[in-house]
């Protein structure tokens, strides 16, 4: 009986150690993806600040804005989300025209705001896993001129296993840019 109890304890300890190792290993992967999301946002912000500091408003800035969209966003997913049910009912031709027009508007808006970006700085606050497929990266945008108050910004990052992270939405002071 004593020998049987000892075997049960040993088996239980092995199970607990295996579970603990499993939690540590998955916790590490979890932390890596949240860290990866935070680094992605910091890289994006640094890239925008570099462009804003060095580029005059010219045709090159439109290409750089377009490149940023390609690197950090899943453009077609975002574009389709902005018009909701109309996307599902649109023909292929209508979708392609919308994608082209929407992209032109987004690139134009981004390119025209680079001068304003020169006076902004981003300060990382936190990154956290939300649900199964989302990471939220929070930070503060500070206007160095003092013209505007600091604003809380949250980046909603899509985290699908086996795929690259990408920005799905951006909220300022809890107001979603995608939903407004």
Where are these regions (language model features)?
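Sec/Tat signal peptide C-region and signal peptidase I cleavage site
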Residues: 27-31
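Bacterial N-terminal signal peptides
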Residues: 14-24
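Early exported N-terminus immediately downstream of N-terminal targeting peptides
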Residues: 33-112
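Solvent-exposed loop/turn segments at secondary-structure junctions
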Residues: 87, 104-105, 143-144, 172-177
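Generic structural "secondary-structure junction" signal
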Residues: 75, 89, 119, 174, ...
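Surface-exposed, charged secondary-structure patches
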Residues: 108-151
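Bacterial N-terminal signal peptides that target proteins for export
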Residues: 3-16
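Short beta-strand edge/turn micro-motifs at domain boundaries
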Residues: 150-179
């Amino acid at each position: 009986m004593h020998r049987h109890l000892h075997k049960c304890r040993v088996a239980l300890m092995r199970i607990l150690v295996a579970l603990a190792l499993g939690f540590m290993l998955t916790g590490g992967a979890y932390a890596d993806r949240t860290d990866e999301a935070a680094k992605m946002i910091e890289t994006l912000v640094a890239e925008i600040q570099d462009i804003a500091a060095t580029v005059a408003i010219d045709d090159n800035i439109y290409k750089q804005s377009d490149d940023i969209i390609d690197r950090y966003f899943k453009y077609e997913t975002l574009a389709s989300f902005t018009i909701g049910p109309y996307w599902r009912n649109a023909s292929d031709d209508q979708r392609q025209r919308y994608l082209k027009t929407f992209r032109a508007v987004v690139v134009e808006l981004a390119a025209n705001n680079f001068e304003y970006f020169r006076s902004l700085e981003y300060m990382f606050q936190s990154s956290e896993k939300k649900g199964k497929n989302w990471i939220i990266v929070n930070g503060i945008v500070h206007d160095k001129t003092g013209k505007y108050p600091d604003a809380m910004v949250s980046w909603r990052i899509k985290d699908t296993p086996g795929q690259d992270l990408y920005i799905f939405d951006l909220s300022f002071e809890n107001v979603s840019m995608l939903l407004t």
